[in-house]
């Protein structure tokens, strides 16, 4: 059983607090689903001393250039010497942490000329890049993946009708094909305590990590 702290989109005062160690002492892993400053992630890592995996969203992308070449500016190159904040960048990658298999996709649906935005087709291409590794996991570990970390939600699950906050159909295909236990996303801000944060879709529990959210990997319930 693992306890995972998920964060996204806003600096949560319950996390960014002198009491963070007391509140989250039993957390095994941290997932950051985008739109957060890296110094906030650095605070979480340095105080909890737990592995933290992250992706960029469509905001707070100033340091994205250190991790990848931006599609619209060939002069900005991936920086191999950048030390970062100690977190592990997961976008368009697959990682194994202990017995947990994770993958991530950053960014949002393309709605203007800003960085880290994708068309539906471009997101399918990002997924295709990971298929060989996913198939290898199925052969070696008996499953493709445990947790998919995204910024945007899947189409029709927790998303909105405006172009920026529309979810990706590609994630529905990913869940149907590779059956992760969890898909953790951000991007959709929650201002009402009654708004839905967790939805079961086929074999996957889809979770909105806005602010912060805790996952227990044994019972697939969070709070």
Could you tell me what each predicted segment is?
Residues 47-49, 85, 201-202:
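Short, structured coil segments at secondary-structure junctions
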Residues 1-47, 61, 136, 140-144:
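N-terminal active-site segment of His-dependent metallophosphoesterases
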Residues 6-15, 56, 60-61, 68-166:
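Conserved catalytic scaffold of divalent metal-dependent phosphoesterases
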Residues 20-21, 41-45, 168-175, 195-196:
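Short amphipathic alpha-helical segments and helix-helix/interface helices
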Residues 6-8, 29-35, 53-58, 90, ...:
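Active-site neighborhood of phospho(di)ester-bond hydrolases with catalytic His/Asp-centered motifs
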Residues 1, 18, 94-98, 174-178, ...:
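Binuclear metal-dependent phosphoesterase catalytic core
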Residues 48-57, 168-171:
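A short, gly/pro- and small-residue-rich
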Residues 11-15, 37-42, 58-65, 110-115, ...:
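Active-site environment of divalent metal-dependent phosphoester hydrolases
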